[in-house]
A protein has these predicted regions:
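Alpha-helical transmembrane segments of multi-pass membrane proteins
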Residues: 17-19, 85-111, 138
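Interfacial/gating helices of multi-pass transporter permease domains
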Residues: 1-17, 85-92, 154
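Short runs within selected transmembrane alpha-helices of multi-pass transporters and secretion channels
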Residues: 24-27, 98-117, 123-132, 152-168
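Small-residue-enriched core segments of transmembrane alpha-helices in multipass membrane transport
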Residues: 14-15, 129-136
Length: 183
């Protein structure tokens, strides 16, 4: 699709990566708290820490998504200086798609950190592989064929939405403690 398309999508993905890195740091703070509580047999603390972390991570990502949506031109303009270019247009489109997908990415990340903290490494690996593998790779082939260059801009955001939905259902299916009242 050309250099402009690649530049626009790359800039959007890197901006999202910075926001996601903050979320990863937050999740890394959650994991030892949850793991310690689980190891000590403090089920109510595991429940509370998961619930608190999931809610605050989703709220944080909603806030970041709203800010990204509102200031998309300014954020992308820091890296792309020509407003009418294909790169700027695709960066804005991709950033808006990321803005919608941010809460879903939070669900996926916190779910993966939760399973890792519990020592359920197979489940943690499965959840972690959803974003960049299981959901992402098929969408790389499907979305550009359906939507052309716009499909390229939507791939990562669509993968995050799918991964977040699958993570939420998997969390509930595996008898997660998130939606039970604390003891």
């Amino acid at each position: 699709y050309g250099d402009g398309a690649m530049a626009g999508v790359t800039v959007a993905n890197k901006i999202f990566a910075v926001i996601f890195a903050v979320l990863v740091g937050y999740g890394q703070g959650f994991a030892p708290v949850c793991g310690f509580a689980y190891g000590a047999g403090l089920e109510s603390r595991v429940k509370r820490s998961l619930r608190f972390t999931m809610i605050t991570a989703v709220i944080f990502m909603c806030a970041m998504g709203a800010a990204t949506w509102v200031w998309v031109s300014e954020v992308a303009g820091v890296f792309l200086h020509e407003g009418g270019t294909q790169a700027m247009q695709l960066a804005a489109l991709s950033l808006r798609a990321h803005a919608i997908s941010m809460p879903f990415a939070a669900v996926c990340l916190v779910t993966g950190m939760y399973y890792q903290a519990l020592g359920a490494y197979g489940k943690a690996t499965l959840i972690s592989a959803l974003r960049q593998g299981v959901c992402f790779i098929p969408l790389v082939f499907i979305l550009p064929r359906m939507y052309g260059v716009d499909g390229v801009a939507f791939v990562q955001a669509a993968a995050d939405v799918l991964a977040g939905i699958v993570s939420a259902f998997y969390l509930l299916y595996t008898n997660c403690l998130l939606y039970t009242s604390p003891s």
